From Swiss-Prot:
Transmembrane intervals: none
Organism the protein comes from: Salmonella typhimurium (strain LT2 / SGSC1412 / ATCC 700720)
Name of a matching Pfam family: UPF0149
Superkingdom, natural source: Bacteria
GO cellular component: cytosol
Cleavable signal peptide: none
Protein name, entry field: UPF0149 protein YgfB
Gene label: ygfB
HAMAP family associated with the record: UPF0149
Length: 192
C-alpha cells in the first residue's frame, strides 16, 4: 500500500489548494509537512504553524483542512513505519512532463527544508551524515535543467535524485525524532 492511496489524489489536493488560494502546490505542501514531521514536530502544533507559514495565520476551509490532516497522518504513519512506505508526493501520469516533475521536486525540497528549519532552528549546525544530506538538499532545491536535454536521460536522473531525497528525508527523521539511548553511567541518579 503506498502513501498515494492514503491521501487525496494529487489533482484533488491541487484543486483544494487553488480553491483556498494557498499559493502552494501539493508537492510543496507535502514537503513542508514532511519537513516539520522529520524535524520532530509530532504534536498538534503543526496546524497553527502550517497556517502561519502558508495562510497568514488563518485556518483553512473544511475540505482543505481535512485533506491536510489526512496528508499529515499518512505521512507521519509512513515515516514511523521505518520509512518503507514514505514517498515524495509528486505529480505523476502521462500528462506530466519530466520538467514538471523536476519543478515539483525542487518545490518539495525547498518546502521540506523550510519545515525542517522551523522545527530545527539550528539546522546549519548539524554535522555528520545528516549535515551532508541537508547540504545536498539545499543544492537539489536549486535544481535546474535545460529543456533541450534528452528527456529519457533526465527522467532516469530525476528518479535517482527523488530516491536520494527520500533517503535524506528518512535520515533527517531518524536524526531528529529518535531518542538517543543514554548510557547507564551517564543517567542521572534517581532520588528515592
Amino acid at each position: 500500500m503506498s502513501i498515494q492511496n492514503e491521501m487525496p489524489g494529487y489533482n484533488e489536493m491541487n484543486r483544494f489548494l487553488n480553491q483556498q488560494g494557498a499559493g502552494l502546490t501539493p508537492a510543496e505542501m507535502h514537503g513542508l509537512i514532511s519537513g516539520m514531521i522529520c524535524g520532530g514536530n509530532n504534536d498538534s502544533s503543526w496546524q497553527p504553524l502550517l497556517h502561519d507559514l502558508t495562510n497568514e495565520g488563518l485556518a483553512f476551509g473544511h475540505e482543505l483542512a481535512q485533506a491536510l490532516r489526512k496528508m499529515h497522518a499518512a505521512t507521519s504513519d509512513a515515516l514511523e513505519d521505518d520509512g518503507f512506505l514514505f514517498q515524495l508526493y509528486l505529480p505523476e501520469g502521462d500528462d506530466v512532463s519530466v520538467f514538471d516533475r523536476a519543478d515539483a521536486l525542487a518545490g518539495w525540497v525547498n518546502h521540506f527544508l523550510l519545515g525542517l528549519g522551523v522545527t530545527q532552528p539550528k539546522l546549519d549546525k548539524v554535522t555528520g551524515e545528516t549535515g551532508e544530506a541537508i547540504d545536498d538538499l539545499r543544492n537539489i532545491a536549486q535544481l535546474g535543467y535545460d529543456e533541450s536535454e534528452d528527456q529519457e536521460e533526465l527522467e532516469m536522473s530525476l528518479e535517482e535524485i527523488i530516491e536520494y531525497v527520500r533517503v535524506a528525508a528518512l535520515l533527517c527523521h531518524d536524526t531528529f525524532t529518535r531518542q538517543q539511548p543514554t548510557a547507564p553511567e551517564v543517567r542521572k541518579p534517581t532520588l528515592h
